[in-house]
Amino acid sequence: MKNTATGYMLTLVSILLSITMLAQEAYAQPGIGVDPEKDSLSMKDLQAYLSKIREKRPTVALVLSGGGAKGVSHIGVIEYLDSLQIPVDVVLGTSMGGLIGSLYSLGYSPEQMDSLVRSFDWDVALTDRIPRKYISYNTTKYKEKILLSFPFYYSKKTYANKLEQDIQYAGAEKKYKKMHFGANDNEDATRQVRDNLLGSLPSGFAFGQNVNNIFSSLTVGYQDHMDFMDLPIPFVCVATEMVTAKPKIWYDGKLNTALRSTMSIPGVFAPVKVDGMVLVDGGMRDNYPTDIAKEMGADIIIGVDLSSGFRDYTQLNNLGDIISQGVDMLGRQSYESNVSIPDVTIRPRLDEFNMMSFDDKSVATILQRGREAAAAQKVALDSLKRIIGPGKTELRNRRAIDINTEPVRISRVEIHGVTDKESKYLQRKIGINPNVAISKATIEDAVATIYGTDGFDYVTYELLGSEEPYDLIINCKRGPIHQFGIGGRFDTEEIVSVLLNFGLNVHKLQGPAFDFTAKVGTNPYAKAHFYLAGSRGPTINFDASLKWTDRNQFKLGTSDYKVAYFNIREELYLSNIRLRKFDVRAGLRNNYFKLNSAMTDKVNGDYDFGNLTNSFLSIYGNLRADTFNDGYFPTSGFTLGLGYEYVFKGLKRHITPFHALTLDFKTVGQTRGSLAVIPSFSARYVFGGNPSLPYLNVMGGAIPGRYLDQQMTFAGINYATAMSNFLAIARTDFRFKLFKNNYLTAMLNYAVSVSDLSDFGDVDKTYGVVGAGLKYSYDSIIGPVELDLHWASRHYKTGMYLNIGLYF
């Protein structure tokens, strides 16, 4: 999922659909899995394993229930059990219980698990987000303008592969009589287009890329297809199969796939599709699998029950509560059957938490509650220990490797899910060579680089093999190739504006693509962008745009700069030219302007006031680096831009050629606690010949380039004010984080303008403006909500600006 607001909406829809579908078979017998015959064989193997242990002592099964964030309490329970030296012979778990149980089964100590869950950035782990630095400049700007984005429609080859899988697992008679493109009749064609379109829509808030890659970093040595009895401690987990509404009991397979499926909360994570199954969170069928432990013949069953019962009216307040209630509803029958099975039941007191309580404070408290709940059962556990006798949990195999702390050597690198040509292209981008030791950071850098191409739904990795050197396999899942996006904003300058975007082939790695963007409302514009991306060399681009700007349409304030103009622009340029950290683009531009003469009111500077209608030919080049970690509220990084344009010809009227140089820089210079100091500097100089009026310097407002591309922001002036040929603005923002997503910013800036640099410093010819403001910001899912009060020496008046939504 590539957009947060879109994800929240689809999350709710997916939850409702999942609950509705599974509720229809809510009373299906929960203990019978999707493959009873295979499950029976696996069960016999486990029974034989326990029988052998029983020759020496009673056998012990540890069952960990699901519960989302509440599952962190399992670590505290395991820590206490280890302190009593109670041996565990098999671990069973569902959802988060499956995750924690798998770590224990892989040989991780409670102390290591404690450290791991505290080190996870859960806000990132539960999404597919990658650091902003891996995303292309164009994609970054798209995401910072578009509120809802819907990728749609698979490529012909991807859809053909999908149909083959559907036919393989569902049966050809349930699909098409003949799989082909360019259908023989209109009904076939319509059906294929419809199914392709609907099938390409997102199935969850996230595909689970980040959480899957967490598993991959912790399970090295156990990532091949295997019997889970061969883990250091035998392990079983449960998922829910949506087609049959039966539990999928994982006794063997790929451990990462099992873990990803057992905690695939509908709507939060996309379902796991494997071997003809559509798998979601196991809690919807068997959230507390003590019945499986009983069937395998464990003599002693210790259960950790995180169920909080049904919530009442006052307790259903947020997404986490709704998800918890839905899971409890669907798994209620199996839970009621299983709850009395354990010999000892440990119930941490976690009523104030829900499935999504992953903040640092909650995680620490939940973990401690697990310790306390286990300690509360000390008498019962001591009694069990006397029955079991001496001994402790023994690992049957080597521990898994955590590549967070222990780099591993790899023998080869393969990228699956792409063509040979694309594989070579991506191999060059990631730059990982075989026969070297690599760390988690190196692998995640490669994964993020590939995912940052915006060509895949998700990118995951595996380290196959039981010992070094391992095979690094990067798995790429192609997604839809087209997209539709919409953004919206209300502010006090333009009232309501809507941004629409439609892209064809924009999620392809290579080849031609087309993108169309239109702004509807005050000062509308439309832009068509065609580009051709190759495996090597720069991207070739052609843009054509129309823009109408009328600053006098709404009388909401005063401005010295009255502007009404019509603009048509064509550009032919090269992009994706890399120069160290800079993205470079260069090309040829034709700019047609038809200006209203009112624009000349109160304009200072050495400009050509006669060229109000003309087409201007120019060549230009831009260098830009952007390392901010967030486009709106960064806490680290910088932006640096350098631009040059040479306007050399007027197609309708003769002009004297002139130049324009621009420079901008912004950084988060210092952060102390909740305070961030953000200095910035921007400058533009138009010189040589007789610069035409459309190229004059402009400053004001909160959005750069709102009325003219060269407009610079200035705290203290709304709308826009025309300035002389040289304009420089120095600014510092002091941003204080009040609490989560809420900020208060003090802004101070100074602008200086002069007609010629040789006159700079001359009191009579240099014009300076001081501006200051105080801004409150809320970082909402629909974009920043901001209100600022400001003042400038330009008019010696105070002003106000309100914005709700993304800037565009």
Write out the residue ranges for each language-model feature.
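C-terminal hydrophobic structural anchor segments
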Residues: 735-768
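Gram-negative/organellar outer-membrane beta-barrel architecture
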Residues: 441, 460-463, 468-621, 625-628, ...
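C-terminal outer-membrane beta-barrel translocator/porin domains of Gram-negative envelope proteins
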Residues: 483-488, 619-739
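Bacterial Sec-dependent N-terminal signal peptides
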Residues: 1-36
